[in-house]
Each structure stands twice: as structure tokens, then as C-alpha cells.
């Protein structure tokens, strides 16, 4: 809930200027060109994974007003990628949920949803 922005370099700007795009979820694509990114395919320099961002949105939309840490983990599980034997980096390597009231976070590696480590700063 609340206001959110993705700040990223514009891949089409020769000066690589920063852009701040209002979004509540994003995966491996440039949010500033989200309307040009198609799901379930590579989109050149613009990236991929729009279907996973949609999976996150579906979970968050289903829990409007009650988005706690459990909902955040549910959204991350919905968007997780299984390993691709032909591309070792094409899978969910880590997932993190940040605490928006305390300087803390919880993280898991490689979709080990039952093995979550919490950190406080």
C-alpha cells in the first residue's frame, strides 16, 4: 500500500538519464517502458518477466488493505522462476521482504521458502 516508484536508467536515452516510474511491482524489465514489454517472452533491451509482475499484482490486488509480510512472501512465491538448465541465472536466486516501519528485512535464497533469514540494521 502507498506510493512507490522504480528509479532506473533509461536504456533508450544516450545520456542514460534516470527515470522514476510509479509502479507497485516490477521484475526484469524496464518499468519506464512497461507498456511495450510483452509477457512470456524476451523483449530485447527492455527485458522480460512481465507475466511475473502480473502474478505479483494479482496477489496484492487480492489482499488490498491487508498487505503484510505473509502477503509479500505469497506474491514473491507467485512470481518465482524455476531453474532453467540451459541458463543458470534464469531463475529466482533470492527473494527479500523489507520492513517498511523498521530498518529490517527477511531474505531467502533459491526458493527455499521455509528457510528465511531476518536481518535488522
Write out the residue ranges for each language-model feature:
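C-terminal, well-structured catalytic/ligand-binding subdomain of enzymes
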Residues: 2-121
Amino acid at each position: 500500500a502507498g506510493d512507490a516508484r522504480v528509479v532506473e536508467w533509461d536504456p533508450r536515452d544516450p545520456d542514460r538519464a534516470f527515470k522514476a516510474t510509479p509502479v507497485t511491482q516490477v521484475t526484469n524489465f524496464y518499468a519506464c517502458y512497461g507498456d511495450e514489454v510483452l509477457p512470456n517472452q524476451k523483449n530485447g533491451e527492455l527485458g522480460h518477466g512481465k507475466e511475473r509482475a502480473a502474478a505479483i499484482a494479482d496477489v496484492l490486488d487480492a489482499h488490498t488493505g491487508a498487505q503484510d509480510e505473509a502477503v509479500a512472501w505469497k506474491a514473491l512465491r507467485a512470481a518465482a522462476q524455476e531453474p532453467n538448465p540451459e541458463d543458470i541465472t534464469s531463475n529466482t536466486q533470492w527473494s527479500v521482504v523489507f520492513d517498511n516501519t523498521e530498518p529490517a528485512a527477511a531474505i531467502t535464497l533459491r526458493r527455499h521458502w521455509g528457510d528465511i533469514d531476518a536481518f535488522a540494521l
